[in-house]
Amino acid sequence: MIIDHLNELTLPLVLDSDCWRGHSIYPNTKMSEQRMVALLQQYGTEKMVVNSAADWGISDPLKVPKTGQAMLAAGFSEAQVEQVLFHNPVDFFAQSGQLDKALVSTPLPIDQRRQWQDNSALRGQEPVIK
């Protein structure tokens, strides 16, 4: 189970439970990147999950990567950022049996030469192929 929309007041109430700890990062309300970083510094990364939204109110779906950048700026390692922003959510959702951890952990090949109905989004740029 995940308890979402946690903050400085509610997170301590969940820490002694077996629940995952969800944090919704929003502009102006709920939780900011800086507040999330402070919680991670104080309580660690175990079972911490960060999410954002693109809903009916003021929102910013890029708050998750912005939180990752704030974590790096605060001295967290890339491995810690990856733990909070990727591995923790994958571990949580994999418990359902509907998500194959190996499948989502395998990088997909990149070939920007591919087109969709003879169209490319490259706009004259050199394609990346990995």
Regions found by a protein language model. Name each.
Residues G22-Y26, E33-Q34:
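Catalytic cores of processing enzymes, dominated by hydrolases/peptidases
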Residues M1-I2, D18-G22, K47-V49:
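Structural preference for beta-strand elements that scaffold enzyme active sites
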Residues T29-M31, H87-N88:
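Short secondary-structure capping/turn micro-motifs that flank functional sites
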Residues P65-K130:
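Mid-to-C-terminal alpha-helical segments outside catalytic/metal-binding sites
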